[in-house]
Structure formats: structure tokens, C-alpha cells
From Swiss-Prot:
CDD domains: ABC_cobalt_CbiO_domain1 (cd03225). This is Energy-coupling factor transporter ATP-binding protein EcfA2. InterPro entries: AAA+_ATPase (IPR003593), ABC_transporter-like_ATP-bd (IPR003439), ABC_transporter-like_CS (IPR017871), ABC_transpr_CbiO/EcfA_su (IPR015856), Co_trans_ATP-bd (IPR005876), ECF_ABC_transporter_ATP-bd (IPR050095), P-loop_NTPase (IPR027417). The keyword Manganese does not apply.
Length: 285
């Protein structure tokens, strides 16, 4: 039996200006895995995330966290936000304390934890995100990538079960993208945290994500593992997305260069294995 940490049932959300942002969303998020939400700008990804965290309340439908409907009382929402943390696309919207240590400690202080527990959690979060050496530095002096790590540490200090990240790789150089995604997968594997990301960086999805949902105009139109989702090439392109670069290369090799592949590989490792197998078969024949 599948273990889902979040269940979304017929979720609708309307903004006060009449915009129908989410339209009958049904979605199950598997516990302890990395899930990507894909879609163009304005399809409702950020609205969905804010519903997950209780920042917004559904117009209709419901969200279950740990098999219980979200409690929208003040106490219930405070408890929910300890368990489901959000890291926004722009960390400057999330960092407001004078120093890194103060900013990271904010959530733990708000939980009214004992001082020694706060220190322990902050030290662990700083170490986990690789920013121990920055703890006394003013937040406004940090690079964009360092600010991202501080924002993640500020959520980690509350020891959440779910970590939601809106465009975690936006604004980062290629090395920064790799480092931040490896950090997230490390947290998922070692701490058991469920990771949910929204991203336009298609190439990271087959490398780091277990599950994928594709949204269009407030609806989920595709879901599955990366291979299942990107196999629907025409649907992907119709919603202004693309295949991962390796997947596109394999598509060209198959359709234009006579290579015979059973599946569309999406990563360098998968492609090398398939091409070597194809090459050996040709030479042996």
C-alpha cells in the first residue's frame, strides 16, 4: 500500500479578483520521495504550494496531511507550518534578520523551544547546509546561492516532514544547481524529508526526482515517474515545456539517425548504457 504524506482532493482556489487558479486538483504526494511540479508561468504551482502550507485556504475541496484534513485554526496552522516548510524562489523575500544565525534560529525561537535545543537545531541546520562559517555574517552580505542555503536552513531548524521549494535552482550557476540539488536529495535520504519542488529546469528532473506532476491552467494533466511523463512528448511540448536535453538527443538519434531504442533515456548514464548496448548488438550481428 502506498504511503502518502499529502493528499489533495478536488482542490479549487479562487482569488478575490475572480481568478480561478486551481481547478479540481487531485494529487497524492508520496512520503520520503522527491516530487517535481512542472508547468509554465501562471499555471497555479505557487498557489498550490501556498495551499499546502496553509497560507491560502481552498475555496473547495480539501488537503490531507498525514491522513488528517488540515486544521485551519490558528493553532492548527502554526503546527502545520512546523511540519511543512516553504522556501521561496527569491530568498530575499524570506530573510529579514541581521545575521545568518539570527535568521536561521527564528523558526525554532517561534516554537518556544528551550535555548539549548535552539542552539543544537541551528548548529545542525547550519552544518547540514554547509554554511557554518557564515553564521555571524550579515544576511545582506551573502551571495544569492548562500542566501538560498540560509533560507533552507531556516526551515530545517523546525525539523519539517515536508520541504517545499519554489524554483530552488533559479539564479544559480551550473555548479550551484548541482550543489543545491545534491543537498536536497541528501536531506531526503538521510532525514526522510519529503521534498516537493516547482522548477523550469527540466534537466534536473530525471536526475533527482522520483515523481512528476505536470500542470496546465490550474489542472494536473500528467503524472508519473520521469520516464512515464516525458514519454508523452507531444503533451509536454503543448504546455510550453520541453524534454530533458539527453531525452531530446535520444529522440533525434531514433527518429533521424536510425537508432533503435525501446525507451527514451533521459540522463547521460541511461543514454550511455543504451548506446553501448545498441553498439554491441550491431557489432555482434
Amino acid at each position: 500500500m502506498e504511503d502518502y504524506i499529502l493528499k489533495v482532493e478536488e482542490l479549487n482556489y479562487n482569488y478575490s479578483d475572480g481568478t480561478h487558479a486551481l481547478k479540481g486538483i487531485n494529487m497524492n504526494i508520496k512520503r520520503g520521495e522527491v516530487t517535481a511540479i512542472l508547468g509554465g508561468n501562471g499555471v497555479g504551482k505557487s498557489t498550490l504550494f501556498q495551499n499546502f502550507n496553509g497560507i491560502l485556504k481552498p475555496s473547495s475541496g480539501r488537503i490531507l496531511f498525514d491522513n488528517k484534513p488540515i486544521d485551519y485554526s490558528r493553532k492548527g496552522i502554526m503546527k502545520l507550518r512546523e511540519s511543512i516548510g516553504i522556501v521561496f524562489q527569491d530568498p530575499d523575500n524570506q530573510l529579514f534578520s541581521a545575521s545568518v544565525y539570527q535568521d536561521v534560529s527564528f523558526g525554532a525561537v517561534n516554537m518556544k523551544l528551550p535555548e539549548d535545543e535552539i542552539r543544537k537545531r541551528v548548529d545542525n541546520a547550519l552544518k547540514r547546509t554547509g554554511i557554518e562559517h557564515l553564521k555571524n555574517k550579515p544576511t545582506h552580505c551573502l551571495s544569492f546561492g548562500q542566501k538560498k542555503r540560509v533560507a533552507i536552513a531556516g526551515v530545517l531548524v523546525m525539523e519539517p516532514k515536508v520541504l517545499i521549494l519554489d524554483e530552488p535552482t533559479a539564479g544559480l550557476d551550473p555548479m550551484g544547481v548541482s550543489e543545491i540539488m545534491k543537498l536536497l536529495v541528501e536531506m531526503q535520504k538521510e532525514l526522510g524529508i519529503t521534498i516537493i519542488i516547482a522548477t523550469h529546469d527540466i534537466d534536473i528532473v530525471p536526475l533527482y526526482c522520483d515523481n512528476v506532476f505536470v500542470m496546465k491552467e490550474g489542472r494536473v494533466i500528467l503524472q508519473g515517474n520521469p520516464k512515464e511523463v516525458f514519454a508523452e512528448k507531444e503533451v509536454i511540448r503543448k504546455v510550453n515545456l520541453r524534454l530533458p536535453r539527453i531525452g531530446h538527443l535520444m529522440e533525434i538519434l531514433k527518429e533521424k539517425d536510425g537508432f533503435v531504442f525501446d525507451e527514451l533515456d533521459l540522463t547521460i548514464g541511461q543514454a550511455r548504457k543504451t548506446i553501448n548496448s545498441w553498439k554491441n548488438k550491431i557489432f555482434n550481428d
